[in-house]
């Protein structure tokens, strides 16, 4: 291969052509990124600056890679431009501007747009990006909970109750909540969510009294019926032709009669009577096909026409009858009308939810990614001069807009790009992608945008031009041939949204591969029901006694593991593209691609058992790991111990260590009630002198656990979540314990990841343990695990990742795992189906009969979604196959070899190269393995290897692809020998090793010195060097004991630090309903008013109220808090002796004065022996007044004063805050150098000034 890359004619066209919009269809391995980078360089050579090009990528990683590649290319151009100073200066400028160039995801570009042009749409520029989807979901849940209550309360028509009943179960209304959230998500992917929601009921609006003359039937249902009947007619016509050719006259006549009946039904489809059409299909006269004996020489042809054409046609019509024609016209129209009422109510509810959610985000100053994109579109397109100016400015700025992975954009993103692009025929959009690799439908990606442009540019050259990059420079020829063999039979416009013909097929371009390297494509099929053939053999019997495959997933992985061992043992040659040389295959060359993450734990466990190093790049089984399940169970019972399953999990775990018998004892002790009550009852009713040793042991474990649980519950109420988690790790030793387990380093990394996730969670708008548990539950529901912190893995290890995760990557050897897994059809089931294009289709629950029936709108929408889902599955398979450079293995399972081949031979029903749509859609064949099997079974090479004399398809006779199909049983796998010995062998080896180890004699005196060592400054380690006054004030609460605490180590060696924190925490917002302002909030507000009040003039009630009103207007105070402030008590302060002095000398008043004071630690902690240890005390003084005689200190307090015993209550307040005032006084004395001539507490609750005894000041400051 030459050092300089030479471009193909189509690549060169994509690099240099300008003047209009360009759509580049770049197949897998076609070098699209290289083309993009080179196009940027060529554009720069024409004088366009890097700041004049907008490059939009699908991911941040892709943007970073693009920026890096452009930087490398620019440096190369700079190197070759030596001697041309002007050119060098230009390239240097581009390099300098590259870090701030517009190369990013579209989200990031929109965010920059908002930060720059927020004023165009009156957006508050101070906002936080709600990037965590789980936090976003929790916030939506809160908003929905509040809105739902309002909707119930104001449901005068009862329509909302009907909506709830229609979509929710008997226990809760979660079904409706899920529907609202999903509808909201679909709406947000459109350029105009409000309009999309408003149009949802439109398909249910019947504009005629006859169903078949309505717009819905004419536009949606009739075309579907016609296509189904045309397919049916085509099958019967093929059967008729086959019968005529073979001289089967009776059969031909029978099929002809059936065809006449089909023609009659087709006429009714275009008529106006639903009931007539329904009756014709329900009573369709198939008659009986004349039989042919199996001994007759014509039987094979008869069997072919019947099984390949006639029977499928009959099943197709039967499906229409049972699915679409259950109800008569009146019933169907009633269902549609009533369903339309519910859809209209849903539209109203989701619109209300959007409004409420937007308001809540505004209140919290947050935006999510959808908000950012919609706001960007509003900036560019709203009807205002400013918007038009911004759009024009951006169109002028960007000479070209490059969009990578265009097939994964949605309608909203398309609208944004269109708003800043030059319109055709001078278009400046350069879009590159491959519709065959569009696999993000679940993110609302719309591949039809790509296809629409393809068709548009083909029809109108002025609109733009299509360029196809078909050469695959990644894979060996057989990988290309095998992929083409599959997809030319599988993918077409009808079902795959693109015809896999001509330019869409892969063309071999990687001619640099040497002939010494072979390329293979193999099916590895594990047979679940085939028994060992040599069961009577003694060796087999011995093997079976020790070896067992528990399930098909384990069997598949063992099959793959042994294949990998074989490849490595054989030193299979591969071509190293980076080193440009042939070398033996290593584990690092092999990647396992999975359709989901479900079986990743099985894969890793089995491969490691075989001694195969493995790393899971996107494991996402984090919450399934033992250590995390135990920690989450513990957090659940700390939040609420009355949960049996989490409690049992913790008791059984190493944290407590109860076994099954001990757990049973607790339940036997109290057979009724929840398990936590049984645990408590056991502890409380325990009588030591009547207990057995077994019971004593259980009691010790349970008592210790309950003590820890109470301690953890206290921490959860008083401290941060991360403090709780770390305390659990320390107190239980669980973090250290898992480090000693297999894969201990990874397990510890997982626990650290939980801590870090809790830390980031608390930086969001949610707090507390309860919400964190909900947060994690939502992560699990979304299958969005916290992936544990990565542990450095060996470079030479097999990789495991999902197909989605592999997109854009390439590997020498690929195993496509779990290929027989049935496709997920959840989005086509349930009470409703939804599509961004066709809207929503629902089941209607009749409130009287309690019968639920699907609306015709649902059936049509479900059919469209089914086809879109199958098309996406085809694209996922295409992505998986095209990741391979030289070898690809498809791994799945079947019951038996005969069952597998029999299923695949249904492909013989297809007379054309592309398999019949009915076969590709068939539920029992809806998986990768059967799709591929059907594509291979018609190939002559398959028949030659596995099915002698079977029918093949002539169109595949010369196909160049080579492949192999292997069927494997559990007997074939046999017992596998991994690197791990049995427990007995391991212990024996460990014992032998230990026996050989010699140790020096122990110096017992030195050992005692080590064990008895006590750090001389132990007290300092338990004392924070920083104390706030609010923490230190308790120093003086007890006049007889002027100490905060006394150092004492616990039994575990843990030390309680010398620092006091408040135990009075505000009730979290999420637990409040209609809440009253807290006393602390009112107190803080009152302080603020006193701070803001102008004392240069005599205060009045009106002036005090004016300050309060202004603070409310500035949104510093809420109206509820403001109403609880008492202006007359504030005013009364200025009638006191100190208040009068303040008014007399306002320029000597100092308010809200912060201070920091270094104090000897011994003055705070009596157990300190060090004389030089100091503590920094920090606080804020409410106010002080300087006078010629000295300083007068005062502090406002809003504490309640007991009117029944006022003197005692005041005395208690003075004792409580005396220490705090004394600290203030000591600080002021040091700050001002003046004596303290008075110190007071002003009690706002009663409007009185109270003196603090002066001797306490002297005691501290001496």
Swiss-Prot record:
EC number: 3.1.-.-, 5.6.2.4
Keywords recorded for this protein, A-Z: ATP-binding, DNA damage, DNA repair, DNA-binding, Exonuclease, Helicase, Hydrolase, Isomerase, Nuclease, Nucleotide-binding
Binding sites annotated in the UniProt record for ATP: 26-33
The UvrD-like helicase ATP-binding domain, residue ranges: 5-476
InterPro entries assigned: AddA, DNA_helicase_UvrD-like_C, DNA_helicase_UvrD/REP, P-loop_NTPase, PDDEXK-like_dom_sf, Restrct_endonuc-II-like, UvrD-like_ATP-bd
Catalyzed reaction equations: Couples ATP hydrolysis with the unwinding of duplex DNA by translocating in the 3'-5' direction; ATP + H2O = ADP + phosphate + H(+)
GO cellular component: cytosol; DNA helicase complex
Subunit structure and binding partners: Heterodimer of AddA and AddB/RexB.
Family: Belongs to the helicase family. AddA subfamily.
Designated name of the protein: ATP-dependent helicase/nuclease subunit A
Species: Levilactobacillus brevis (strain ATCC 367 / BCRC 12310 / CIP 105137 / JCM 1170 / LMG 11437 / NCIMB 947 / NCTC 947) (Lactobacillus brevis)
Gene name linked to the record: addA
